[in-house]
């Protein structure tokens, strides 16, 4: 026996489901990453928060010792996008913070006063640390890659690499 309820047919069900979806979406808070403005002196402490591997939730915090205030998620708040997956390290050189995000295969260059991205270097295997030799040359070590990358920080590009032939996958990374 088939039970047929009046008004419970496709003509009613489809619009009802659509209406419920619209009502629920209207109640949800969507965060599209609105950008905030910062005007710090750059004189403070940056804290790279590694985040969980493969969750893309790394973040950058800034502690101002004068105000004794910590600002969390400053990269996200200044740029409207997440830092990425596993913030490994950060180096400051000439007013630019270089944030190495290893599982996202990127190094972000940020203004240390505004936290805004001013450039990025991409196409690494899994970068870990950056070491500057000059304004136009830096080395980037990696994990699970037997090369040390040579980059030009002014042009935000990889210019070459140094082979480390005795490095094996068991030894892990080129900084060892």
Model-based region annotation:
Residues 26-176:
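Predominantly soluble domains enriched in secretory-pathway, periplasmic, or organellar proteins
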Residues 1-26:
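Sec-dependent bacterial lipoprotein signal peptides
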């Amino acid at each position: 026996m088939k039970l047929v309820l009046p008004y419970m047919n496709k003509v009613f069900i489809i619009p009802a489901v659509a209406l419920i979806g619209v009502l629920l979406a209207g109640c949800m808070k969507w965060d599209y990453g609105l950008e905030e403005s910062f005007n710090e002196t750059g004189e403070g402490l940056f804290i790279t928060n590694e985040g969980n591997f493969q969750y893309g939730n790394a973040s950058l915090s800034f502690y101002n010792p004068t105000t004794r205030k910590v600002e969390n998620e400053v990269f996200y708040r200044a740029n409207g996008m997440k830092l990425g997956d596993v913030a490994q390290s950060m180096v400051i050189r000439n007013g630019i913070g270089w944030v190495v995000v290893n599982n996202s295969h990127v190094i972000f260059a940020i203004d240390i006063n505004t936290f805004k991205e001013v450039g990025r270097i991409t196409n690494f295997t899994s970068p870990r640390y950056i070491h500057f030799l000059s304004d136009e040359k830096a080395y980037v070590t990696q994990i699970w890659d037997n090369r040390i990358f040579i980059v030009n920080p002014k042009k935000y590009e990889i210019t070459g690499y140094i082979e480390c032939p005795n490095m094996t996958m068991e030894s892990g990374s080129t900084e060892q």
